Amino acid sequence: MPPIPSLWIRVFFSWLLLSLPAAAAADFSHCGGCDDGDGGGGIWSTDNILQCQRVSDFLIAMAYFSIPLELLYFATCSDLFPLKWIVLQFGAFIVLCGLTHLITMFTYEPHSFHVVLALTVAKFLTALVSFATAITLLTLIPQLLRVKVRENFLRIKARELDREVGMMKRQEEASWHVRMLTHEIRKSLDRHTILYTTMVELSKTLELQNCAVWMPSESGSEMILTHQLRQMETEDSNSLSIAMDNPDVLEIKATKDAKVLAADSALGIASRGKLEAGPVAAIRMPMLKASNFKGGTPEVMETSYAILVLVLPEDGSLGWGEEELEIVEVVADQVAVALSHAAVLEESQLIREKLAAQHRDLLRAKHETTMATEARNSFQTAMYDGMRRPMHSILGLVSMMQQENMNPEQRLVMDAIVKTSSVASTLMNDVMQTSTVNREYLSLVRRAFNLHLLVKEAISVVRCLTGCKGIDFEFEVDNSLPERVVGDEKRVFHIVLHMVGTLIQRCNAGCLSLYVNTYNEKEERHNQDWMLRRANFSGSYVCVKFEIRIRESRGNLLSSSSSRRLQGPNSTSSEMGLSFNMCKKIVQMMNGNIWSVSDSKGLGETIMLALQFQLQHVTPVSGASSDLFRSAPIPNFNGLQVILVDSDDTNRAVTHKLLEKLGCLVLSVTSGIQCINSFASAESSFQLVVLDLTMRTMDGFDVALAIRKFRGNCWPPLIVALAASTDDTVRDRCQQAGINGLIQKPVTLAALGDELYRVLQNN
């Protein structure tokens, strides 16, 4: 579509040109024509001229009639609202001009008055419309000039838009290159692969001649060339270095933007080598570590930077523009992120390898510890069995000897031996338990016992110990001591022996004194050592103080320093083998206290023990002895057929004697297989089976199950088991195996008789 001003100029000139022939034709026709003879003959005759004018007027009229149609189409298709009125005026003017020419065709021949009138009216209307159009053009010309100015403005805007579109296209192309480079860079998490991929892809995108990466040295004093795209011709290209205080290095590290290096830059010359090259650009890349990503309190850390150097070819066709530098900056940021991820992965891998090595070391140490623990437990178990079995045999024999007729002095000595053996057996169980589970845990068995008898037995044992050591012994017992109290008899006896053994071990000659009396809370309130923890006893209670004092003669000094107290961590142990810490815990469990007092002259030392006991009133039932080793009547099982199963020869012989003492008919076997074979014979009529649970080849649980299974159709015999421990686990297994009774070792005559009596009564 042609511009608007040129269109109106054409219309204006066509109006001027067409109006002149119409006026001339009208004047010519008004003269009435000329004579045929005046014009001469030929082509320029009057008739030919008139015919030519008539045809011309017709063509002009047709052209004038077609122009308004074009103007009307143009006005409807274009948004020319302010110019539509002038378009209509031009259309009317052109139509009237065409009408004038059309009427003029009829004036070349003789015509009527109506033709002249019509021509006159047409000319008059044409004159009015042309005059109005001329006036309208006077107001339209400034608008046309403004349109021209706007056209120039639009042309300028179009050129600016073209430039912006080109810039957007270049930015889109740069973004595509950046995305492609980022995609290639992030394909790998290896640091060297990332740097090599960066150099290759940047070289393809920016048409580089060379690309190099400079890394800081371990000392941080210089930059070392570590990666380059093309190997230089110099022999020491792999050992090139630049000082860290180089101006270009400092300037590059000071800003995050890319920098174009000067032609004489040492960094640029070292990066391009001996080859001639074009402009050189460089940018920093942060080298982050895994420690930079750890949480917690922020720490001031100096960031380490690498330098990426890019060298263009020498031909001069390429340069470092803003777009190229922007691509380099974005790629450098992406490389920094990828390198940080690679650093995190490398450090994580190193940590993982260290943890794996530590885990292997821990597993090896755990395996060695487990093997050592198993070896220690095996050794302790073997040692415990070697010590426990003879002790159990001795206790069994002593319990049988207690039933013999003896005088009071012999009875006292025998009871002391029984009590001492029982304490030793309990101590072995405690040592085995605490060493196996690696904890200092001991249990108390509170029951009623005779305090007077305990003191007598303790005095008897202490007299024997001091006599063997060559030390004098004296004692004093308060007559106000209650006869029967509730507590752990074995633990109290053991602590007293521990105190005596500790003092005797430190003395070579002197006198040992034992004082037992009741504790008066009102009189001793000022003494902090007497501050006892109040026990939760439902009834009345009594506090008893055991005071053991050693006085050495002046010619002999104590073997240990007088300032050394039992509470110290390096205190010696007693002959019974129990440490003072364990002894103190036992005393605290019994709501008591233990402490020592040394003589200022170093000639004596006193150990005091304060305990609380619950009182038990003496009744006809409770007045009898309830001790484990008592002289009460033993039941008799005359004719009871018993089979004894025990792999230990000594214990089997002692248990055999105990059963015979109870009146049983006993058959002893050494293994569970022999026991099962004994039941296979038709003559077997055993009513009771006494078996040890800890046999070597076949334990007691399997033997009990086999007996129950073998005698399923017949009446099965009663089974009583012998075990070193009677905890809930052992009792549950005995119940599952069909065992009727359980006796804890050491087996004594009284305990064996009571359990057999209970089993026979219940079954």
Curated annotation (Swiss-Prot):
CDD domains in UniProt: HATPase_ETR2_ERS2-EIN4-like (cd16938), REC_ETR-like (cd19933)
Ranges that cross the membrane: 58-78, 86-106, 115-135
PANTHER family: ETHYLENE RECEPTOR 2 (PTHR24423:SF633), TWO-COMPONENT SENSOR HISTIDINE KINASE (PTHR24423)
Similarity comment: Belongs to the ethylene receptor family.
Cofactors: Cu cation
Cofactor note: Binds 1 copper ion per dimer.
Predominant cellular place of this UniProt entry's protein: endoplasmic reticulum
Name of this protein: Ethylene receptor 2
